[in-house]
Every structure is written in C-alpha cells, then in structure tokens.
Curated annotation (Swiss-Prot):
GO biological process, one term: 2-deoxyribose 1-phosphate catabolic process
Location in or out of the cell: Cytoplasm
Name of protein: Deoxyribose-phosphate aldolase
Organism: Vibrio cholerae serotype O1 (strain ATCC 39315 / El Tor Inaba N16961)
GO cellular component, one term: cytoplasm
C-alpha cells in the first residue's frame, strides 16, 4: 500500500464526518450515518446539530455501528461570551445523548483582552459534560490570526479542562491551516498534556494529501503513535469522498463547496 493510501486509511478512521448546514434534514443526517460506515472502516464520529442526535443514534444503532460517536456543537458558530447560554446548550446536548460536544470559545472576548470569560466558559462546559462526554473547544484560529492569541487561547482551553482543542467552525473565511495546526500542536507538547489533550483541524482539509500533511506534522511534534482517535480528529465532510477515491473504493466526486 502506498504511503498516501496508508495516510488515507488512517485519516478516515479519525474523521468527524460533519454536516452543519442551515438546510440539514433528518434525511441528510441519516445519509451521513450511512456514509460514516464505509467499506474500509468507520469514521470515528459524526458531527451534527443537537436536534438531530436522536435520529442519528437510532440510525447508527439500526445499521450496526453504535460505536460511531456522535459529536454536536454549542455556542456555535459565533462564540459569544454568554456563559449561561453556552452551558445550557451543552447540558441540553448531553441530555440528547451526545458523546462529544464541540463548543466555540469566546474568541472575540480574548481579542478584546478578556481571558477570564473563556476560561470560565470552558471550565463550566466541561463540568456540564462530566467524565463521559468529550469537550472539544473551537478557538477560531482564522479570526484570532496572531500566533500569540492562538497559543493563549489554546493554553486557556487546556487549563480549563478541554479534552481537545479545535481550529475552526468552518463558518469563517479562513479555517484550518497547517501553520495554525503547528502552533496548537506545539502548545499541547510544551504544556506536557499530550496524554490527555487532543487536536482537531476543521474546515479546509479536503484531500488525502492534506490529511497526510497534517498527520505527518502530528507525528513529528508529538510522536508517531500519538494521533489515535482519542487524540486526533479531522472535522470534514468532502474529505471522506476523496479518501475513498484514494483508497479506490469509490469513484464519486467530492462536492467542491463542502466543508
């Protein structure tokens, strides 16, 4: 198997296969669940809006893949600084049956100089998740832009108890980039938290070559056995089709407009 195919198979099993569109329907989410069960292995998770969790849970169970995790989003996509709302949404997501919650960090507050609200929001959302539900925190790297802010946001999230730090919502002009990924992975390394904290690039990872580049970077910074499904995810939709093409199990074309 070529190096690219090896990377493609590895990436597929690390995917949070995502649909977060305003026009999502039960039918689209059911199809997403079907797609997550691929001929060469399952994606790690699906990522959907909270209202679709019950239909997704039912579909995954009925198709014999209850182990595919269900991730959802809160405080999404704007990352407002109202802690009560973020916590209430997170509690509701857990009550719906989410296995993982991707919450948006109040990045505009950090840009304005307020570090405390982000810390408090993440800490309280993690408390709402408890030990069983993973909390991934989206810092919106493409809006923070500066290395100092990206590293500070990553540090705050980790100190407040985040299980993962995630680049982007996919709803702003600039999402995951290798440059931003490196900054965040270096924070995980430098804080000595690689055992407990994972990383998720999201938006803009569209091809097997992209995934290979991101995984090689993780291997370089945190070691070749670090990037398993507890420590690494790709947030993507169109990536799956490209990975399956690379692995020669489909000839579908990816949607060029997809996340």
């Amino acid at each position: 198997m070529s190096e690219l195919k090896v990377a493609a198979l590895r990436a597929l099993k690390l995917m949070d296969l995502t649909t977060l569109n305003d026009n999502d329907t039960d039918a689209k989410v059911i199809q997403l669940c079907h797609d997550a069960k691929s001929p060469v292995g399952n994606t790690a998770a699906i990522c959907i809006y909270p209202r679709f969790i019950p239909i997704a849970k039912k579909t995954l169970r009925e198709q014999g893949t209850p182990e595919i995790r269900i991730a959802t989003v809160t405080n999404f996509p704007h990352g407002n600084d109202d802690i009560e709302i973020a916590v209430a949404e997170t509690k509701a997501a857990v009550a719906y049956g989410a296995d993982e919650v991707d919450v948006v960090f109040p990045y505009r507050a950090l840009i304005a100089g307020n570090e405390q609200v982000g810390f408090d929001l993440v800490k309280q959302c993690k408390a709402a998740c408890g030990d069983k539900v993973l909390l991934k925190v989206i810092i919106e790297t493409g809006e923070l832009k500066q290395e100092a802010l990206i590293k500070k946001a990553s540090q705050i999230c980790i100190e407040a108890g985040a299980d993962f730090i995630k680049t982007s919502t996919g709803k702003v002009p600039v999402n995951a980039t290798p440059e931003y990924a490196r900054m965040m992975l270096e924070v995980i390394r430098d804080m000595g938290v690689a055992k407990t904290v994972g990383f998720k690039p999201a938006g803009g990872v569209r091809t097997a070559e992209d995934a290979q580049q991101y995984l090689a970077m993780a291997d370089e910074i945190l070691g070749g056995d670090w990037a398993d499904s507890r420590h690494y995810r790709f947030g993507a939709s169109s990536l799956l089709t490209n990975l399956l093409n690379t692995l020669e199990v489909t000839d579908q074309k990816a949607d060029p407009a997809a996340y």
